[in-house]
């Protein structure tokens, strides 16, 4: 999915509001995903998936860091996320549908924490961005 100039502006502006909370929001989105879509827990059998666990927080930080990297490379998502794509496709073998589920949970988390900034236009831009990230992360499955 191609991000327009307006989408890129919206994504960068929204992510700037996330600031140093990317890891916290990533962890919250993971918790939402585990609660709303329990089958996603199968990829984390070695994790303590309870609320506030150190392992979920650590993985949430990885998610937040990856999204921060992606926001910084909106014009080259495939290059920026190539290593993560390899990891998820070849080593972890995550079912691609799970990226969509996590994206949904990330949007919900951002809407809760950024209510004044989460306009319909920003929502649409973030949705396109997360869809683009998901597409890149699943590109090496083929």
Curated annotation (Swiss-Prot):
Residue(s) carrying N6-succinyllysine: 8, 12, 17, 41
Molecular function (Gene Ontology), one example: iron ion binding
GO cellular component terms listed in the entry, alphabetical order: blood microparticle; haptoglobin-hemoglobin complex; hemoglobin complex
Keyword Phosphoprotein part of the UniProt annotation: yes
Function: Involved in oxygen transport from the lung to the various peripheral tissues.
Subunit-level organization: Heterotetramer of two alpha chains and two beta chains.
Family: Belongs to the globin family.
Official protein name in the record: Hemoglobin subunit alpha
Organism the protein comes from: Equus przewalskii (Przewalski's horse)
Gene encoding the protein: HBA
